[in-house]
Amino acid sequence: MGWLFLKVLFLGVTFLGCLYPLVDFCPSGETRGQKPNFVIILADDMGWGDLGANWAETKDTANLDKMAAEGMRFVDFHAAASTCSPSRASLLTGRLGLRNGVTHNFAVTSVGGLPLNETTLAEVLQQAGYVTGMIGKWHLGHHGPYHPNFRGFDYYFGIPYSHDMGCTDTPGYNHPPCPACPRGDRPSRSLERDCYTDVALPLYENLNIVEQPVNLSSLAHKYAEKAIQFIQHASASGRPFLLYMGLAHMHVPISRTQLSAVLRGRRPYGAGLREMDSLVGQIKDKVDRTAKENTFLWFTGDNGPWAQKCELAGSVGPFTGLWQTHQGGSPAKQTTWEGGHRVPALAYWPGRVPVNVTSTALLSVLDIFPTVVALAGASLPQDRHFDGLDASEVLFGWSQTGHRVLFHPNSGAAGEFGALQTVRLGSYKAFYVSGGAKACDGDVGREQHHDPPLIFNLEDDVAEAVPLDRGSAEYQGVLPKVREILADVLLDIAGDNTSRADYTRHPSVTPCCNPHHVACRCQATGWTDFPTGRC
């Protein structure tokens, strides 16, 4: 353990250690009525068509559909990348991966994480007097100062990366199936590269591993319980709060829960959707009972469905990427086709966000940072540029204008990680590179470069089936604008205060509560309750 981490650990625990589990709920002069609370819920691998309010074929999201009817639904809302870590880094920084340094996923053995000179949303709100909590999937570094407790979150409860990145005793549904954790002295090996069998999946509460391996069957219940506790105690304290939830749903493995047993005859994915919907419903109910008029709830997703998981993957709705499917491969997660980054999104704030409104504004996960900061009355860092915009006027029904331009970074299917080779301009979308991710049948679409680019008009072709004729007046009118926009953003990034993530790996940073066991197995230490708030 390096001296830097020891110093950060000492300072963090000294500052927070007077109350376990590291949350100071004591009043600090702020009252809840002065500033709004924020609950941001991020689903994992959820398709645009998985939300019933978006797609009539989906019948498993009653609570989310109710939230859509009681708030605002966004139909042209996009993840900042088409894979886990980059999308989450952009949510917390308001910056694309070429600026914040996170262009692809971190591993179990990753030494680094979201670069330390990047300012997170939680850090800005902490400075503004908020109590901050993060529950669920982090996936932005877990070693040393990259842990959520050192990135602005007073409280953390969750898995530090995707819940398929470690073995469990209850593996759940996956494609292909993965083995359970070993119980003896010998590791259980799998020939499948997507199965992690060496180390059990850890569950953290703040800096401590409280369960390894995680019991996936009860994980949703624990997340709901901790979220409800956090909202309760933060509300009682008189301080405004930020709760960021990174759900395990709908990423594989899909757990074999009691709900799954009740819904016999239903597909596992549908049962998982209902469990996720129930979890979100519990959190919304708690908000409604505790701080309804002063809490803004934002629900969205990190990227589109993971098509290679076949029947365990979600629905892209009408965004089928037909041009790419004809070339081979999947046009969903890891790609820059609409199915990879167009995600469900809902906003709920009684009395502030209008009821039962569908917004067509072009918005992004990038906008969460500047919007929340503005609503909190805080200030953006002045030493860097941001790619998100303050969407308050859209949220309050005063405008339908979002981005004119949006960039979709390469996310693994084709091109260099993080590179900006897909550009949205109004209803037009230009591809300088294309490629399909691995599909259910194992097919992968080959990488193709296009200069001049493929350009689609999404107003007439949401399926991205037929690109504009390069000789047409419409194409020739759009092309120079796309080229100018792309050149401008690259020039801006070159002159910006950018970061570079450390992607080196070392087995010594693997989370392990019992190095004497082949899979790091240990008994749960028991759950802690939040402090009473007495000072």
Swiss-Prot record:
Glycosylation sites: N117, N215, N356, N497
Residues binding substrate, per UniProt: K137, S162, H251
Annotated compartments: Lysosome
Molecular-function GO term, any one: arylsulfatase activity
Modification after translation (UniProt): N-glycosylated with both high mannose and complex type sugars.
Enzyme class: hydrolase
Location of 3-oxoalanine (Cys) modifications: C84
Co-factor remark: Binds 1 Ca(2+) ion per subunit.
Signal peptide: 1-18
EC number: 3.1.6.1, 3.1.6.15
Alphabetized UniProt keyword annotations: Calcium, Disulfide bond, Glycoprotein, Hydrolase, Lysosome, Metal-binding, Signal
Binding residues for Ca(2+): D44, D45, C84, D302, N303
Active site residues per record: C84 (nucleophile), H139
Record keyword ATP-binding present: no
CC cofactor: Ca(2+)
An example Gene Ontology CC term for this record: lysosome
Gene3D superfamilies named among the record's database cross-references: 3.30.1120.10, Alkaline Phosphatase, subunit A
Pfam assignment, any one: Sulfatase
Reactions the enzyme catalyzes: an aryl sulfate + H2O = a phenol + sulfate + H(+); Hydrolysis of the 3-sulfate groups of the N-sulfo-D-glucosamine 3-O-sulfate units of heparin
Function: Displays arylsulfatase activity with pseudosubstrates at acidic pH, such as p-nitrocatechol sulfate. Catalyzes the hydrolysis of the 3-sulfate groups of the N-sulfo-D-glucosamine 3-O-sulfate units of heparin.
Family statement: Belongs to the sulfatase family.
Protein name, entry field: Arylsulfatase G
Source organism of the structure: Canis lupus familiaris
Gene designation per UniProt: ARSG
